[in-house]
Amino acid sequence: MNSVSPAAAQYQSGSPEDARRPEGRRPRGPRTPDPNSLGPSGASGPALASPGVGPGEPDEVDKFKAKFLTAWNNVKYGWAVKSRTSFSKISSVHLCGRRYRFEGEGDIQRFQRDFVSRLWLTYRRDFPPLAGGCLTSDCGWGCMLRSGQMMLAQGLLLHFLPRDWTWSQGVGLGPPESSPNRYRGPAHWMPPHWVQAAPELEQERRHRQIVSWFADHPRAPFGLHRLVELGQSSGKKAGDWYGPSLVAHILRKAVESCSEVTRLVVYVSQDCTVYKADVARLVARPDPTAEWKAVVILVPVRLGGETLNPVYVPCVKELLRSELCLGIMGGKPRHSLYFIGYQDDFLLYLDPHYCQPTVDVSQADFPLESFHCTSPRKMAFTKMDPSCTVGFYAGDRKEFETLCSELTRVLSSSSATERYPMFTLVEGHAQDHSLDDLCSQPSQPTLRLPRTGRLLKAKRPSSEDFVFL
């Protein structure tokens, strides 16, 4: 057989009984927010509790819904993880800009180490109530925010650590929920601190620090609480659906307001167009001779009408082959996934839909297992939702120029005149161009190809095509 199933390509989870058991069956009283907690001050929003229930007090129906949804997600995930993910021995696998061929055991191990070192941010439960309500889990609605967190986390890994960095404890992980460490209350949460040490330990310290920035606590700069708070200015609240374009702008605001990350900015493209002068103005320093800031470039796009237009698939593959690409925040309709690579006609992704208990990251040795996935999964390009956001990272001026050269080549490589580029890269500022010149969504019908290729082969529906909300 010309396929291989790496040992670390197995989903590892708790027992089926654990997956089916709703978390929180142990009796406990209603959670009332501590007025002296570290939650965002002045946060307001519509109460989510039923009439007659005090603010911040979830009624029994709300608690049952949350428990049932958590259990349902984990049962569904548990069924999906029983099968192996097979990879072809013939075709290359592209992961975060790196190319792998499974020709020997060493190749498989290198792929395993690289994959498991990506940060995996999923649904969580039992965290402090979100602003404006009593929700203590994002199960069923927060998957796009989690995908956005994973994309930003990949940018931070590139920003603070070498590209060839891998988590030394990654291979051979146990079940994601094997650790009993859980959140113990908001009142005493503080970012962890570590002493300086050897280069390897310093990299591990930085790794843990990055993970802690995504903690499910109001004071974490890129945590769910902060992202939900920033979404309120766009009319969103906890429990709402967030699209990939909105999440891109939320991430930009989060980085802008983060005091821990000072030499990194986020640029979000306008109308499918990246304006090079606007990016340069954002990253340049007052001193012309000073080094540029690093930049994460987020490009919200729509690659078709109701379904993905197959003409964009070659371009998506080209972008995922670049080491400067952070991946794609997208997924299937109303089912967000974080795409980080591909093999043949299948995307590789990290799935945020597994609900795990919240981890208390205030301790220096908090467990990292639940923030790393041991199980690469694949999805056909044909199932990809056309609405998504592509991310890129440039650490300095030279990398930005390299990125511009790569994008110019990829976006202009199409030989078919009827094809539209995914987005455009132009000189100058946005204000220098009229709205008529911007790359908005084409009004012409979606180009369809004959039903002869593998990409358009009919497939039987599966449970993955439906999302319980």
Swiss-Prot record:
Q: Which reaction does it catalyse?
A: [protein]-C-terminal L-amino acid-glycyl-phosphatidylethanolamide + H2O = [protein]-C-terminal L-amino acid-glycine + a 1,2-diacyl-sn-glycero-3-phosphoethanolamine; [protein]-C-terminal L-amino acid-glycyl-phosphatidylserine + H2O = [protein]-C-terminal L-amino acid-glycine + a 1,2-diacyl-sn-glycero-3-phospho-L-serine
Per its UniProt record, what Pfam families does this chain match?
Peptidase_C54
Q: Where is this site: Cleavage?
A: 62-63
Q: Which SUPFAM superfamilies match?
A: Cysteine proteinases
What are the entry keywords?
Apoptosis, Autophagy, Cytoplasm, Hydrolase, Mitochondrion, Phosphoprotein, Protease, Protein transport, Thiol protease, Transport, Ubl conjugation pathway
The Gene Ontology biological process terms listed for this entry are: aggrephagy; apoptotic process; autophagosome assembly; autophagy; mitophagy; piecemeal microautophagy of the nucleus; protein delipidation; protein localization to phagophore assembly site
**Which superkingdom does the taxonomy of this entry point to?**
Eukaryota
Ranges for region Cryptic mitochondrial signal peptide: 63-102
User: What processing steps or modifications follow its translation?
Assistant: Cleaved by CASP3 during apoptosis which leads to increased activity. The cleavage by CASP3 reveals a cryptic mitochondrial targeting sequence immediately downstream of their canonical caspase cleavage sites which leads to mitochondrial import of the protein.
Residue positions of the PTM Phosphoserine? Answer: 462
Q: Basic and acidic residues compositional bias: what residue ranges?
A: 17-26
Q: What are the GO MF terms of this UniProt record? A: cysteine-type endopeptidase activity; cysteine-type peptidase activity; protein-phosphatidylethanolamide deconjugating activity
Q: What is its EC number?
A: 3.4.22.-
Which GO cellular component terms, listed alphabetically, does the Swiss-Prot or TrEMBL entry include? cytoplasm; mitochondrial matrix
Q: Does the keyword Protease apply?
A: yes
Q: Where is this region: Disordered?
A: 1-59
- Sequence ranges of Polar residues compositional bias: 1-15
Indicate the family of this protein: Belongs to the peptidase C54 family.
Q: What is known of its domains?
A: The cryptic mitochondrial transit peptide is revealed after cleavage by caspase upon oxidative stress and cell death. It acts then as a functional transit peptide, and allows the import of the cleaved protein into the mitochondria.
Query: By what name is this protein known?
Result: Cysteine protease ATG4D
Name the source organism.
Sus scrofa (Pig)
What taxonomic ancestry is recorded? Eukaryota, Metazoa, Chordata, Craniata, Vertebrata
Gene name of this polypeptide: ATG4D
